[in-house]
From Swiss-Prot:
The organism of origin for this protein: Hahella chejuensis (strain KCTC 2396)
Protein location: Cytoplasm
Matches recorded under InterPro entries: AAA+_ATPase, Chromosome_initiator_DnaA, Chromosome_initiator_DnaA-like, Chromosome_initiator_DnaA_CS, DnaA_C, DnaA_dom, DnaA_N_dom, DnaA_N_sf
Keywords: ATP-binding, Cytoplasm, DNA replication, DNA-binding, Lipid-binding, Nucleotide-binding
Subunit and partners: Oligomerizes as a right-handed, spiral filament on DNA at oriC.
Origin organism lineage: Bacteria, Pseudomonadati, Pseudomonadota, Gammaproteobacteria, Oceanospirillales
Region annotated Domain I, interacts with DnaA modulators, chain positions: 1-80
Protein name: Chromosomal replication initiator protein DnaA
Length: 467
């Protein structure tokens, strides 16, 4: 009964809170107990303290509303329902500040090459270079509300590798700075300890190395490479999906590193529990440390990024010009930087001053989609017809999923395709608050990463509304 009560409570919290907050702090909690006590297990001390400080009051309120009897007493503990395996124990110890386990003496496999790249090799059969980009540092990373928590967590890991949050799991859409943050940690560790053994790579590199090792009968060397590092940084972990043999080997690598107190940082385009065709035991382990979402940057952060990049390129970019680009390019940092590079290149070749008018001409093809004038009324009508509901349903206070999802879709499209502010969009959707619109946009971004049907719907709407 207590378990059912907790699931109902989670449903209310998911509706009330922004997706990032819910996924980071509340979704990882596990519950068990009796009629008198609800025991909540947090994966680490950081989550436990944050839930206790920020959410425990609201949890108590919801539980009291859901039961006619006295609400169960809530206790928070670090751990897991499934018990204390070695890996879990290592995770919990690291979460509460245990000191780094001293690993046996092992050969140095990462050093600084003359070019600044970090070369990583395995003797004999397997050899490849996996490097940290020296420009990806915390100093060159522009902080904003969208990435504030992720940056803070990454800096904690850089200061205390292997004992802060292990693994650190960063997720979010493409081009939002996950790789930059991950490599910033590696560069910070390396700066403090030039003898540190850092290995950064894409998940497909791990798969390719494993296949090569099997072909050359060099699997022991493969395992020695990946298990002898001080920090393992793997990008786009979702590419392990459907690769059963790779998942099996990474599972054992994960356990070996965790038990050795070696740091892991993983990135993904979606929340770990939402990765299809990935073993449950792996998805569970991904959540043992700290899971943080990196969101699309808000306008102020986009402007700051542009100004920073222009400064690094020794190019004068007025705040007016930066604001113009930031208003037009809203999808991700990568596209934003690409647009700026195109503008700078055109200015260099033509000798013209960078102004909003010059930018519009340079980016006319890229901005074509954003320049389409689409009304909120047209968006609401198109979405309602597509999902076979009434416009009145979209504007209503109904919260059933069959109405909520189309409403969130329409709000996200309105933000993407119109120049209306969030309060104006909220007002057009039945007098809702701007935070509701912002939450709807976040939900759509996340669902597009995990739900192919919804992603196709969104792309279809974009085509219909801009054609």
């Amino acid at each position: 009964m207590t378990s059912e009560l907790w699931h109902q409570c989670l449903g209310y919290l998911e509706d009330e809170l922004p997706a990032q907050q819910f996924n980071t702090w509340l979704r990882p909690l596990q519950a068990k107990g009796s009629e008198e006590e609800l025991l909540l297990f947090a994966p680490n001390r950081f989550v436990l303290d944050w839930v206790n400080e920020k959410y425990i009051g609201r949890i108590n309120e919801i539980l009291s509303e859901l039961t006619s009897q006295k609400a169960p007493r809530i206790s928070l503990k670090i751990g897991s329902i499934t018990g204390n395996s070695k890996g879990q124990q290592a995770s919990k110890d690291s979460a509460v500040g245990a000191t780094r386990t001293t690993a046996p003496s092992r050969p140095v496999i990462a050093d600084v090459a003359p070019s600044g790249e970090r070369n990583v090799t395995v003797e004999g059969a397997i050899k490849h270079e996996s490097y940290l980009n020296p420009t990806f540092t915390f100093e060159t990373f522009v902080e904003g509300k969208s990435n504030q928590l992720a940056r803070a967590a990454a800096m904690q890991v850089a200061d205390n590798p292997g004992s802060a949050y292990n693994p650190l799991f960063l997720y979010g859409g493409v081009g939002l700075g996950k790789t930059h943050l991950m490599q910033a940690v590696g560069n910070a560790i390396f700066k403090k300890n030039p003898n540190a053994k850092i290995l950064y790579l894409h998940s497909e590199r791990f798969v390719a190395d494993m296949v090569k090792a099997l072909q050359l009968n060099a699997f022991n060397e493969f395992k020695r490479l990946y298990r002898s590092v001080d920090a393992l940084l793997i990008d786009d972990i979702q590419f392990f999906a459907r690769k059963e043999r790779s998942q099996e080997e990474f599972f054992h690598t994960f356990n070996a590193l965790l038990e050795g107190g070696q740091q892991m940082i993983l990135t993904c385009d979606r929340y770990p529990k939402e990765i299809d065709h990935m073993e449950e035991r792996l998805k569970s382990r991904f959540g043992w440390g700290l899971t943080v979402m990196v969101e699309p940057p808000e306008l102020e952060t986009r402007v700051a990024i542009l100004m920073k990049k222009a400064e690094q390129a020794n190019v004068h970019l007025s705040s007016e010009s930066a604001f113009f680009i930031a208003q037009k390019i809203r999808s991700n940092v990568r596209e934003l930087e690409g647009a700026l590079k195109l503008v700078i290149a055109n200015a260099h070749f033509t000798g013209q001053e960078i102004t909003p008018a010059f930018i519009r001409e340079c980016l006319k093809d890229l901005l074509a989609l954003h320049e389409k004038q689409v009304s909120i009324d047209n968006i609401q009508r198109t979405v309602a017809e597509y999902y076979k509901i009434r416009i009145a349903d979209i504007l209503s206070k109904r919260r059933t999923r069959s109405i909520t999802r189309p409403r969130q879709m329409a709000m996200a499209l309105a933000k993407e395709l119109t120049n209306h502010s969030l309060p104006e969009i909220g007002e057009a959707f039945g007098g809702r608050d701007h935070t509701t619109v912002l939450h709807a946009c976040k939900v759509m971004i996340e669902l597009q990463q995990s739900d192919p049907t919804l992603r196709d719907d969104y792309q279809n709407f974009m085509r219909m509304l801009t054609s």
